Each structure stands twice: as C-alpha cells, then as structure tokens.
Amino acid sequence: LKPLHIFIHGGYWRALDKDYHAHMSVPFNKNNILFFNINYDLCPKVTLSDICNQTIEAIIWIFNNCKNYGGNNKKISISGHSAGAHLVSYLLNIDWSMYDLPKNVFQGAALISGIYNLKIVQKISVNKELNLSNKEVQEKTTLNKLPTFKIPLFISYGENEPEGWKHQSISYCDFLTKNDYKYKVIPSKGDNHFTLIDTLANENSNICKEIIKLSK
C-alpha cells in the first residue's frame, strides 16, 4: 500500500476549486504517493463551520476508503494553502478518536501561507461573503490552539508576500514556540501568495521536497 497526501485549496473559503490545483499531484505521483485533492462548498452558500465539518467528513472518508485506491491509512500526510492551511490547522486540533480514528491520524502536515487569526478576517471586505459570527471566530481561530498530537510540522510563506500575510504564519510559529511544539519553517524565496502554488507543484522546490519527505 502507498502513503498518501491530502491537499486542501485556498480562496478565502469563498472561491476556487480543487481542479485549479490538480497539477500539484504530479510530483507526488512520481514519488509513488497517492494524492487526494479535496473540495468543499464555498461561502456564502455555506458557513465556515459547515466547511470545517466537510473537511472532517473528507478525512474520515479518505481514512476508511483509501485502501480501495491502494492507499495506506497509517501513512497519511496533509497540506493546505491560504484558507486551506487554516483548515489543516483546524484539523490538527481535532480529537480524531471521537470519530473512531487514530488520535494521530496524520503522520505529518504542511501549512503554506495560512490564515490563523480570524478576528482580522472579520474586519475586511471578504467578510461580506463569509459573514463570520463572533462564535465562529472564537471557535475556528487556530492561532491560540495547539495541535492535539505531535507530528512533523512544516510551515512556509512567500518572501514577497504582504507583511500581513507573513505575520499570520510568524504569529502561529511564535505560539507554537511558546508552547514547546516543534516545527520547521522555510520562507519561500521570491514567491508571493499566488506563485506559491506553482512552487508547491515544482518537485525541485524546497517546499515540495519537504512535503514529499513528510509524506513517505
């Protein structure tokens, strides 16, 4: 059975689709790693809470069905970009034993230019579509929540991103450091928030190499 990697796309929870990121499967396939590229409904059709629940359902389905595709559910890694990185950080906070899954369902995770403090999102224009409630902001902000299990964790952001985007990742790293949670951070030289996607799909990039390493 092959190890498998799960990717969650970004788009501020309100845009894009897994098909925009299908090219990311190439380096994983070359390394004999199954690639699961998951989708979710978008705001304002659904709430952020709905999206979080959908990603939980996706993980449960993949865990229970990956063997049908030749996958090893004991070797699951996961990554996400932007809003997708937020969703991955949220999934790291779940007690998976509540769903009859191993508590440490992931063997490694990569957070690429994520959004971890939703209080900021609540104050900007995209919130017209997200319509985040105060309860959602409190429950779904991951900046102050430690992962429920310790795994290799890789955090990256683009060197040329706006300071606000960088600050999200740096603040999350600071929180992990204060709580003695080990991680590895690699800024991606020359990248902005959007070119990071192509870098993720480039098997010669540091980010892609690190994620492949997490996945084996």
Describe the residue ranges of each PLM region:
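Alpha/beta-hydrolase superfamily serine-hydrolase fold, recognizing
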Residues: 1-216
